[in-house]
């Protein structure tokens, strides 16, 4: 059975935090995708949109790259620490 946003959203803190951190830096999704590519993470626009929309889970490699690019801690993205 496929999870819907409201079902997945309670278990996916990372997406909302990535979205907030990206916007705080004034970065567009396209810019974040380009930086992910530079860091060896292959994600397309749909994947990032689904991640930020809390529809898609993040991998460990993506999590570390996102934290580095957005200049936040992995703990912040996981909801375990304030920014």
Regions found by a protein language model. Give the residues of each.
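A detector for short, charged/polar N-terminal pre-domain segments
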Residues: 1-13
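Short basic helix-loop element that most often maps to the first helix and adjoining turn
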Residues: 16-38
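Conserved hydrophobic/aromatic packing and binding residues within compact polymer-binding modules
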Residues: 18, 32-33, 48-51, 77
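Helix-turn-helix DNA-binding elements, focusing on the entry/boundary residues of the two helices
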Residues: 18, 29, 45, 60-63
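Recognition helix of helix-turn-helix/homeodomain-like DNA-binding domains
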Residues: 37-58
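DNA major-groove recognition helix of helix-turn-helix/homeodomain DNA-binding modules
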Residues: 59-76
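Short, basic amphipathic alpha-helical segments that act as recognition/interaction helices
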Residues: 82-83
